[in-house]
Amino acid sequence: MTKKILVVDDELHIRMLYQEELESLGYNAVTSDGSEDILPLMDREKPDLIVLDIKLGQDKSGLDLLQEIRSQDQNIPVILCTAYDSFQHDLKSIAADYYVVKSVDLSELIDKVRKILD
């Protein structure tokens, strides 16, 4: 069965880049800009993994969405994406599984996805 990945990022070109790359590797990638309520989206799509941007352009940050995600599902893997080189949070304390620095080179993200899903 094809694994489903929910990509949440406010930047359209990032969503499209991630979706294209993930689908080329055989995953089913669903995207959101973060403006839709995350819990109904999770109920509808039932992702196996969430790739979540930390800095969204809406009223909520990715960390806010992560808290909502964890209120519904403690077990779904979440990879946080950031444009910042240094991420000053303890992943365990914020309930994330991994984080990656956004880059044109998606090898780090793909490595984490494969580690989780394969």
Each PLM stretch: what is its role?
Residues 31-49:
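Acidic, metal-coordinating helix/loop segments flanking the phosphotransfer/catalytic sites
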Residues 53-54:
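Active-site residues of response regulator receiver
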Residues 12-30:
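Two-component/phosphorelay signaling modules centered on CheY-like receiver
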Residues 46-48, 72-77, 89:
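His-Asp phosphorelay/catalytic-motif detector in bacterial-type signaling
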Residues 64, 84-102, 107-111:
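Alpha4 helix (beta4-alpha4-beta5 surface) of REC/receiver domains from two-component response regulators
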Residues 9:
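Conserved acidic carboxylate
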